């Protein structure tokens, strides 16, 4: 909004106020000065300011409104315009008018006035000058009066040619109403465009003849022209949301609709109407006005807001600091003065230091809570006049269990050499997985579905990194994955996924690089769960969604000791690796973070065992068994028969090849024996191993190898 300082000075005495001081006060008060304009009007130099206000301060979008704000900031008394007092006797007249039919929620006030005896439509020169100083080119017709009132008071008025209205209704009298348009009806507007309407659009009608789309634009057949001698003036307050909805639907925005969209109050509508008629009477002293009809919906009674001095001090802080570290805060007397400046009615309780403040209706949209009143006090005092101090922390926050779990996992993965990555939860439908959770109205085709796994995004990142000529990237990610139906049973679970391997590792410069093997990669995942103190076991992968990107024979599901499936681990499928141009010796994992957290919370008691000071005895055990026998089963049998001295079992080798029968495999196990009470003897351990061999022969038909 462009405002002329000369016009402002007519309403407030700011002759002695420095321009820089004015700009600083306005900016700190929430009205940013975007540009300073130097104008020359009738050989007189003037200064204008381009000001923007926040969305909730629609009351300041006029010369009168911004003048009241400047008066509050500089503790000046604004001049009361004569027409404010002169229009008071209109209030009773309007109450006795014909009530029009209208929507209580969409039209908050409606007043119509008839003017007759318009002979001279010339616009006074001083009005034209003020329009120019506000960035509006005068047209020297009725539109200038509309624009001037909009600038001065903030209220938009609609003008209709009364003679044309009479010719349309074909009766000497007519009634006004606000009705919904009929579906399929048409409206030819003053901008020469024909609009097709439906029943969501409201129309202002005279005897059921549409004369305007409510709050937006007039009917082309009843607009004013240079020979208009009588007027029907509409002054109304419409719901901001309704006007916004209609404007968007019809793809039309006018000065009227733009003003309604920012919300208006009916507080000074009658005064603005009186001012408009007074301006028209300057060139038409014999002008006759008659009230036609009116309707006002009673506004809600606003409850007082209690403002507490202690809260003001806590929020805004001190204004000064003495040398003895004593802090000085804004005084209750100063707060009272600021409330008076803002024209807020209040009752002050000196015993409790509370103000019971009644907000004027024109500020009811932006001041609804105590914190809003505190902001007003801060604005008038100047936020830059408060000391910048950090608040005292009463209690130190604790890291919750979720954070602690993440920290443990992240620490291990970072130590593995992995980098934390972040991807969008919205992905393209063209991934390795069939994403059936589609968005109804996606912004981009690449972000049209919700991801059902973290792994496709990780693979695409590795591929893109290699395309840029970089080395293989090993990384992990925390993120939510989705399942179910987006309309009914959509579930969202947090997972941690990762990708590693694919590079040749050298122990020294002259040796040939070695790729990460399956058991080494699997061992890294087992080590993670050892760090978390969680027992797991492995099962053959039966997850259908992983078959497209995990190796059919080198992938497995991970289960907790409780039997809950918490994720999957495997090597990249060779076909997909070839398609993406990646190494097939890349490994992926995806773990249910929520289940891991639940399991860790259940492990509340940590049991520590004494470290043995006695030596260990290690024995190797080799045998051939059928392929379908799981290692878990063997482990249970050996631990059950290895006595209390058996402390650890390690799988050293799994061999399939020459001299091994079909559908069989050769295993080599390393058994570690140790006692907490004595030094074990070899003959003692030999008896245990001999018994283990016998048990394995009986239970799993193991063929022992010497």
Swiss-Prot record:
Q: PROSITE patterns, from UniProt?
A: B5 (PS51483), FDX_ACB (PS51447)
Name its cellular compartments: Plastid, Chloroplast
Q: Which Gene3D superfamilies match?
A: 3.30.56.10, Bira Bifunctional Protein, Domain 2, Ferrodoxin-fold anticodon-binding domain, Phenylalanyl-trna Synthetase, Chain B, domain 3
A single cellular component GO annotation: phenylalanine-tRNA ligase complex
Keyword Cell inner membrane appears in the UniProt entry? no
Return the InterPro entries for the record: aa-tRNA-synth_II/BPL/LPL, B3/B4_tRNA-bd, DNA-bd_dom_put_sf, Fdx_antiC-bd, Fdx_antiC-bd_sf, Phe-tRNA-ligase_IIc_bsu, Phe-tRNA-ligase_IIc_bsu_bact, Phe-tRNA_synthase-like_B3/B4
* Major subcellular location class: plastid
> Does the UniProt entry include the keyword Magnesium?
yes
User: Bound how, and how many: what does the cofactor note say?
Assistant: Binds 2 magnesium ions per tetramer.
Required co-factor(s) are: Mg(2+)
Q: Which residues are noted in the entry as Mg(2+)-binding?
A: 366, 372, 375-376
Top-level EC class as recorded in UniProt: ligase
Instruction: State its Enzyme Commission number(s).
Output: 6.1.1.20
Q: Name one Pfam family in it.
A: B5
Q: Quaternary structure per UniProt?
A: Tetramer of two alpha and two beta subunits.
Instruction: Give the record's family classification.
Output: Belongs to the phenylalanyl-tRNA synthetase beta subunit family. Type 1 subfamily.
Q: What name does the UniProt record give this protein?
A: Phenylalanine--tRNA ligase beta subunit, chloroplastic
The organism named in the record is Phaeodactylum tricornutum (strain CCAP 1055/1)
Name of the encoding gene: pheT
């Amino acid at each position: 909004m462009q405002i002329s300082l000369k016009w402002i000075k007519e309403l407030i005495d700011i002759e002695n106020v420095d321009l820089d001081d004015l700009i600083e006060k306005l900016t700190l008060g929430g009205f940013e000065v975007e540009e300073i304009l130097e104008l020359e009007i009738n050989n007189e130099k003037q200064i204008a300011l381009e000001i923007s206000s926040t969305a909730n301060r629609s009351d300041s979008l006029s010369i009168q409104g911004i003048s009241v704000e400047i008066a509050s900031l500089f503790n000046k008394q604004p001049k009361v315009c004569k027409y404010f007092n002169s229009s008071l006797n209109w209030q009773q007249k309007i109450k006795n008018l014909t009530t029009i039919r209208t929507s209580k929620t969409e039209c908050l006030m409606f007043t119509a006035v008839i003017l007759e005896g318009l002979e001279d439509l010339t616009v006074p020169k001083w009005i034209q000058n003020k329009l120019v100083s506000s960035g509006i080119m005068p047209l020297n017709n009725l539109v200038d009066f509309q624009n001037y009132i909009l600038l001065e008071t903030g209220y938009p008025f609609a003008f209709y040619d009364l003679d044309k209205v009479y010719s349309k209704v074909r009766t000497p009298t007519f009634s006004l109403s606000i009705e919904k348009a009929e579906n399929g009806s048409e409206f030819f507007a003053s901008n020469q465009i024909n609009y097709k309407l439906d029943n969501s659009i409201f129309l202002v009608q005279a005897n059921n003849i549409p004369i305007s789309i409510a709050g937006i634009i007039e009917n082309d057949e009843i607009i004013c022209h240079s020979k208009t001698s009588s007027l029907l003036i509409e002054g109304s307050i419409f719901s901001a949301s309704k006007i916004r909805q209609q404007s968007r639907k019809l793809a039309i925005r006018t000065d009227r609709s733009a003003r309604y969209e920012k919300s208006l109050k009916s507080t000074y509508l009658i005064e603005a109407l009186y001012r408009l008629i007074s301006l028209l009477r300057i060139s038409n002293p014999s002008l006759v006005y008659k009230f036609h009809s009116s309707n006002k919906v009673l506004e809600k009674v606003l409850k007082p807001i209690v403002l507490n001095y202690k809260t003001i001090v806590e929020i805004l802080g001190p204004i000064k600091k003495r040398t003895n570290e004593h802090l000085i805060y804004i005084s209750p007397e100063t707060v009272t003065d600021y409330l008076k400046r803002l024209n807020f009615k209040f009752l002050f309780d000196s015993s409790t230091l509370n103000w019971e403040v009644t907000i004027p209706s024109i500020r009811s949209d932006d001041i609804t809570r105590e914190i809003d009143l505190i902001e007003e006090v801060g604005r008038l005092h100047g936020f830059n006049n408060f000391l910048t101090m950090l608040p005292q922390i009463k209690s130190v926050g604790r890291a919750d269990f979720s954070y602690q779990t993440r920290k443990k996992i992240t620490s291990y993965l970072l130590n593995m050499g992995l980098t934390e990555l972040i991807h969008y939860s919205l992905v393209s439908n063209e991934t390795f997985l069939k994403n059936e959770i589609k968005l109804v109205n996606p912004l981009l085709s690449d972000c049209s579905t919700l991801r059902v796994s973290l792994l496709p995004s990780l693979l695409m990142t590795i591929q893109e990194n290699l395309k840029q000529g970089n080395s293989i990237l090993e990384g992990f990610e925390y993120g939510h994955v989705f399942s179910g139906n987006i309309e009914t049973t959509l579930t969202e679970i947090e997972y941690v996924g990762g990708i590693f391997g694919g590079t040749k590792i050298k122990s020294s410069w002259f040796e040939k690089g070695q790729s990460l093997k399956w058991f080494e990669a699997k061992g890294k995942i087992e080590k993670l769960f050892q760090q978390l103190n969680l027992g797991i076991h492995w099962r053959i992968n039966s997850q259908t969604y992983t078959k497209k990107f995990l190796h059919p024979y080198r992938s497995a599901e991970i289960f907790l000791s409780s039997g809950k499936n918490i994720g999957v681990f495997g090597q990249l499928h060779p076909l997909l690796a070839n398609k993406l141009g990646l190494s097939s010796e890349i490994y992926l994992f995806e773990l249910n973070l929520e289940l891991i957290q639940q399991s860790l919370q259940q492990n509340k008691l940590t049991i520590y065992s004494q470290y043995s000071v006695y030596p260990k005895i290690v024995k190797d055990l080799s045998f051939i068994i059928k392929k379908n026998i799981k290692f878990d089963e063997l482990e249970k049998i050996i631990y059950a028969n290895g006595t209390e001295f058996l402390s650890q079992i390690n799988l050293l080798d799994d061999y399939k090849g020459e001299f091994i029968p079909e559908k069989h495999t050769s295993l080599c196990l390393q058994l570690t024996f140790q006692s907490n009470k004595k030094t074990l003897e070899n003959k003692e351990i030999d008896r245990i191993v001999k018994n283990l061999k016998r048990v394995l022969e009986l239970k799993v038909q193991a063929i022992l190898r010497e």
